[in-house]
């Protein structure tokens, strides 16, 4: 059955009147403006009666499609600039920096609706977390292509990516860096110092302040070690390196050092006197040292007994000399004779009834062969031989008077009846008696073991090979 064109136009008008009005719906962030429309996607069966009413020639069958921050590329069956006619298919895309949410392609349906919805959402990366001991600055917040540059606090070094860029997939490029404390602490030692040793000492007590230490990162110093003596220690002569090392929390370390120099003021080395020797305190030539002059057996000192090393590095006084001991036998008493030997010489008094006594001859012969050992031990021999009035007393070649001989015998209880001998120390005390001849070695052993002072013992060690 054929219908007239008028009838068709009336049916189309009725269809338009019966279709509900489409009110554009706008959602925040949808990408559509409030005065624009979009259609939800659904499947629609078009009745046969209505299908005959569809007209592809109507230019504006659906609402004009417009997507904010994006673009709709449409293809109409009519071609040309028809972008919303029935059957028009539009490809949806977003500007750079935006992501399409929804359908990529929609079509204008007979229901005058578009077959789906879509909008453009701005691409944003998540907010970057702050890093310990550091920060970052971004060129455009968290938006696409924004570059965030990291930096560390003073004293820290950045390890990892220095910059991160917000990419199109909404993720940041690279990885999260860290700030690492790699800078060592700052340490400053006290200045080097020099000090003179005190009088009669070879050391000096030196004090100093602790080093100045500061950490360039978090300010925390965990440990400071010292290599060398502590402040206030006694330092010997010479240069001494004092080293401090500081450690921070990250086990970085820094060291500094300074020098402690101790000087000893010294005088020129003294020479011992001829036929004598020196005993000195301390090192023997340092400031405050005292050197005493001593003479060998059979010699006596002429001049000052000691000299002192002064701060001017010169010795006080003048050196004495050792001269052969002069024994005055022309004295009025035995006491006057013995006083000349007090603290200077030991005495070995040999008494015999007559010069022909075999013990006497044997003893004198052995002693004459041991003059060196006797002199080293400061021993003077006095001989008392014979009977009055022919009795003889002598010290070396000097003769003693009969009165002195008699007093000596009485003081030391020496008989004329038989051979006897007495050993007297430097203080005038009877230390040993002999009734028979003894070898010089026996006498020397007794003196070395019991009568020598510490000074003389040291001297004996120095001279142990002298008489050999």
Swiss-Prot record:
It is found in: Secreted; Cytoplasm; Cell surface; Synapse. GO terms for molecular function: hepatocyte growth factor binding; identical protein binding; signaling receptor binding. Keywords: Angiogenesis, Cell adhesion, Cytoplasm, Disulfide bond, Glycoprotein, Proteoglycan, Repeat, Secreted, Signal, Sushi, Synapse. Residues 180-264 form the HYR domain. Residues 1-25 form the signal peptide. Disulfide bonds join 74-108, 94-120, 125-166, 152-179, 267-309, 295-322. Residues 72-122, 123-181, 265-324 form the Sushi domain. PROSITE patterns: HYR (PS50825), SUSHI (PS50923). One of its GO terms (biological process) is positive regulation of synapse assembly. Contains chondroitin sulfate chains. GO terms for cellular component: cell surface; collagen-containing extracellular matrix; cytoplasm; excitatory synapse; extracellular space; glutamatergic synapse; synaptic membrane. The keyword Glycoprotein applies. Gene3D superfamilies: Complement Module, domain 1. The keyword Repressor does not apply. InterPro entries: DUF4174 (IPR025232), HYR_dom (IPR003410), SRPX-like (IPR043555), Sushi/SCR/CCP_sf (IPR035976), Sushi_SCR_CCP_dom (IPR000436). Expressed in angiogenic endothelial cells (at protein level). Acts as a ligand for the urokinase plasminogen activator surface receptor. Plays a role in angiogenesis by inducing endothelial cell migration and the formation of vascular network (cords). Involved in cellular migration and adhesion. Increases the phosphorylation levels of FAK. Interacts with and increases the mitogenic activity of HGF. Promotes synapse formation. Required for ultrasonic vocalizations. Forms homooligomers. Interacts with PLAUR (via the UPAR/Ly6 domains), ADAMTS4 and CTSB. Interacts with HGF; the interaction increases the mitogenic activity of HGF. This is Sushi repeat-containing protein SRPX2. It comes from Mus musculus (Mouse).
């Amino acid at each position: 059955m054929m219908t007239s064109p008028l009838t068709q136009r009336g049916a189309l008008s009725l269809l338009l009147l019966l279709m509900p009005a489409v009110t554009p719906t706008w959602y925040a962030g949808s990408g559509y403006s409030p005065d624009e429309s979009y259609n939800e996607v659904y499947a629609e069966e078009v009745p046969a009666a209505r299908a005959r009413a569809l007209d592809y020639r109507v230019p504006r069958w659906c609402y004009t499609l417009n997507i904010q921050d994006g673009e709709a590329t449409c293809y109409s069956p009519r071609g040309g600039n028809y972008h919303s006619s029935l059957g028009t298919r539009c490809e949806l895309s977003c500007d750079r920096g935006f992501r399409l949410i929804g359908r990529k392609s929609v079509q204008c349906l007979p229901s005058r609706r578009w077959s789906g919805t879509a909008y453009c959402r701005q691409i944003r990366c998540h907010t970057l977390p702050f890093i310990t001991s550091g920060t970052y600055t971004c060129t455009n917040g968290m938006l696409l292509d924004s570059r965030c540059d990291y930096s560390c606090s003073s004293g820290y070094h950045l390890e990892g990516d220095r910059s991160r860029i917000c990419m199109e997939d909404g993720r940041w490029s690279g990885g999260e860096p860290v700030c690492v404390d790699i800078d060592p602490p700052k340490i400053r030692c006290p200045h080097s110092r020099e000090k003179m040793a005190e009088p009669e000492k070879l050391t000096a007590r030196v004090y100093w302040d602790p080093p100045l230490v500061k950490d360039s990162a978090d300010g925390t110093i965990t440990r400071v070690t010292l290599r060398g003596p502590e402040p206030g220690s006694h330092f010997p002569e010479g240069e001494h390196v004092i080293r401090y090392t500081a450690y921070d929390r990250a086990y970085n370390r820094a060291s500094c050092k300074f020098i402690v120099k101790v000087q000893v003021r010294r005088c020129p080395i003294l020479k011992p006197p001829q036929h004598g020797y020196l005993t000195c305190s301390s090192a023997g030539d340092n400031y405050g040292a005292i050197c005493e002059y001593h003479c060998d057996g059979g010699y006596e000192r002429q001049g000052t007994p000691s000299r002192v090393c002064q701060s001017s590095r010169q010795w006080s006084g003048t050196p004495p000399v050792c001269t052969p001991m002069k024994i005055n036998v022309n004295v009025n008493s035995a006491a006057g004779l013995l006083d000349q030997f007090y603290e200077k010489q030991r005495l070995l008094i040999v008494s015999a009834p007559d010069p022909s006594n075999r013990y006497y001859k044997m003893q004198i012969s052995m002693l004459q062969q041991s003059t060196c050992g006797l002199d080293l031990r400061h021993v003077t021999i006095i001989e008392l031989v014979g009977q009055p009035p022919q009795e003889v007393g002598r010290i070396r070649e000097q003769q003693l008077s009969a009165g002195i001989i008699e007093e000596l015998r009485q003081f030391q209880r020496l008989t004329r009846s038989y051979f006897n001998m007495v050993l007297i120390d430097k203080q005038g005390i009877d230390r040993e008696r002999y009734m028979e001849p003894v070898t010089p070695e026996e006498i020397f052993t007794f003196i070395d073991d019991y009568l020598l002072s510490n000074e003389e013992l040291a001297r004996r060690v120095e001279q142990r090979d002298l008489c050999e």
